[in-house]
């Protein structure tokens, strides 16, 4: 009897070890879908429901020929309002007026430009804007997306139960369906950070997960109606840095750079626009935290300052660094904040941010970087290199962020 119990115990341990190994292999395989944070253009903030295939083709042409693809922006993310219901076989279909050529033809066109195509659905029966969603049709929709040539699915959580176990189950069901669809399709968990997705989204199959409610085109939420400003999302993301890594990213939502208060949904709930200093801080901190980068401005009619911020290859290189670590905040007295991010090749990135409404003089002891006698500081926004010893000092304007890559001499 004792021997039988011993053998049973060994068998159970072997089964448990096998299941754990299988889960690890599954997570590892899914992680490979986004080894660096995805970059691209998302339709929602500027166009909301006013989208069509001609617009997507124009955006693809622009990205392929005017610096965006070269800088790393490979995706076009079609957000809500593309759906046209279901056909007689319950296959989800695009709106025939908006996408008369069909999604496969559009995906083929986007791919011909060297780009990737993302699409949107919801883990309920309806999307946030009231269109057909995928709950109950996960396997069927995943196969349809694969047949179309879709590369990424943003999966929202409107009209779904406010329960983390239910959310985990619904996202995992779609992730499994995508994995079995015959095509590699990354999954973006868009649950807005309310059910602690950092604890379960990766295990559910997500390549990234939202940390907050939707971003608005503003520095800070003052009206308190549910919109999130740039600094609000930074504050939420700060303590979550340990959850980020290759294939599983903290999604801080879209970049509002260049919207200038003229977007659609981004301009409600107090979203009156930002200064370009604030836009530059958003780009800086999204890159420091290794967030996906989804531009959302009028990309077909943009100004030079917007392009300067969004196409800066040095700040993008920090975002896309292969080590995949997110920045962490270090103790520093005063009104300014200091963030460090470890980079590949024995390098570091450091960001000094002034979140206050007044200029701040900063004297930063370089001992926080280590015990080297001298450092090379590369200013990624000014594109200048300097030697620094003991203390770095400067005056930062309100809401300004300085970012440097640092190497020892």
Where do the protein language model's features map onto the residues?
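Bacterial Sec-dependent N-terminal signal peptides
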Residues: 1-29
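Structural recognition of the beta-strand scaffold that forms the well-ordered cores
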Residues: 37-43, 72-79, 116-121, 151-156, ...
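Aromatic-lined carbohydrate-binding/catalytic grooves of carbohydrate-active enzymes
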Residues: 59, 63-164, 170
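Aromatic-lined carbohydrate-recognition surfaces of secreted/lumenal glycan-active proteins
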Residues: 115-131, 179-196
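Glycan-recognition surfaces
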Residues: 186-297
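Carbohydrate-binding surface patches
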Residues: 280, 286-289, 294-296, 332-370
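Catalytic cores of secreted or luminal carbohydrate-active enzymes
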Residues: 281-330
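C-terminal beta-strand-rich structural cap/linker in extracellular carbohydrate-active enzymes
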Residues: 387-409
